[in-house]
Swiss-Prot record:
GO terms for molecular function: nuclease activity. GO terms for biological process: rRNA 5'-end processing. It comes from the Bacteria. Belongs to the YqgF nuclease family. Could be a nuclease involved in processing of the 5'-end of pre-16S rRNA. The keyword Nuclease applies. It is found in: Cytoplasm. This is Putative pre-16S rRNA nuclease. NCBIfam families: RNAse_H_YqgF (TIGR00250). SUPFAM superfamilies: Ribonuclease H-like. Its EC number is 3.1.-.-. Keywords: Cytoplasm, Hydrolase, Nuclease, Ribosome biogenesis.
Length: 143
């Protein structure tokens, strides 16, 4: 493969960012970008810097689904964000089911002894790691 993939956990106020290694085997946290989706501030200025730095071949967005698998308003917002992202940066966009990733991220931080006030700073980028890692695992090359 030898190309990176960015993983994004898109919310209404933040975007958690993760990146794969060059082999597409592991995901690492990058940062959390503050956005204001209602005001149309999508964090694309900062994403442009990260895209230039990491040169990803693709971006994977978390797709929030209901527990029964149906897509709701948040999934529609994620797909809209993905369309805008693809148009802005001419990158392939893929989607990964993100059910329970934020809960998993919070559990990891709690188990790691991270204080409540510090968890908020890390939860979105850790959720982005889980989204991207799930995608990488599902699309791993079979050797």
């Amino acid at each position: 493969m030898f190309a990176r993939i960015l993983g994004l956990d898109v919310g209404t106020k933040t975007v958690g960012v993760s990146v794969s290694d060059l082999l597409g085997m592991t995901a690492q946290p990058v940062e959390t970008i503050k956005i204001d989706s209602e005001a149309g501030e999508l964090g694309f200025d900062r994403l442009a810097v990260l895209i230039k730095e990491y040169k990803p071949e693709k971006v994977v967005l978390g797709l929030p689904k209901h527990m029964n698998g149906d897509e709701g308003i948040r999934a529609e917002a994620s797909r809209d964000y993905g369309t805008k992202l693809a148009n802005e940066f001419s990158l392939e966009v893929a989607y990964q089911d993100e059910r329970l990733t934020t809960a998993q991220a919070e559990k990891v931080l709690i188990d790691g002894g991270v204080r409540r006030k510090d968890r908020k700073k890390s939860i979105d980028k850790l959720a982005a790691v889980l989204i991207l890692q799930n995608y990488l695992d599902a699309h791993a090359l079979k050797l």
